[in-house]
């Protein structure tokens, strides 16, 4: 009766088939858990480091995917509008302020009649803040890269010490003890392998992030120079000298 109900359920709702765990997964899960426990206590901090690395990778991936997908369109819209109307360009940048490039372009556009130097300083100050946000998570990844192999090595050393302490070296040692020693050494090396895998993954993520940050620095510099050039050529009007300065200059003449 129960089997008939299951068949009817899967026939009416095929999506349940994809939700059901596969037999391979069910058989491999206890084996993976056993291998994890064989590594000893050091495997738990390695597990924590792997979770931190994965979390950082997903968070940074979400940040960069949003920025890279939308920034080109935002830049084109702002620069095209800046040639005709700075107010419209400011509104477009304001609408995109959830992105780093939007905040970067908005900083000089919200100033009232700035000089070119002030215009550039506003972009540079905002760029420094945005680059600091882009580097978020780098220190954590660097720590994981350095710490994970050391933890793996520590687990291997403690495992080897535990293995050799259990051997009866003075008694000559039997074949069973030799087999047990070989098994213990193999289990001790699990932590080294785990530490290396965590460090390699963190290193790959870190290098990708550093590459993206370098590209964005060049991109921000190019976009900022283009916006500043538009402002200088189209909108900037040098202020006339104040009357009192003109008077002082005439008095100073011989």
Curated annotation (Swiss-Prot):
One of its GO terms (cellular component) is plasma membrane. It is found in: Cell inner membrane. The chain crosses the membrane at residues 39-59, 141-161, 185-205. Keywords: Cell inner membrane, Cell membrane, Membrane, Protein transport, Transmembrane, Transmembrane helix, Transport. One of its GO terms (biological process) is protein import. Pfam families: MotA_ExbB. It is a multi-pass membrane protein. Belongs to the ExbB/TolQ family. Involved in the TonB-dependent energy-dependent transport of various receptor-bound substrates. Protects ExbD from proteolytic degradation and functionally stabilizes TonB. This is Putative biopolymer transport protein ExbB-like 1. The lineage of its organism: Bacteria, Bacillati, Cyanobacteriota, Cyanophyceae, Synechococcales.
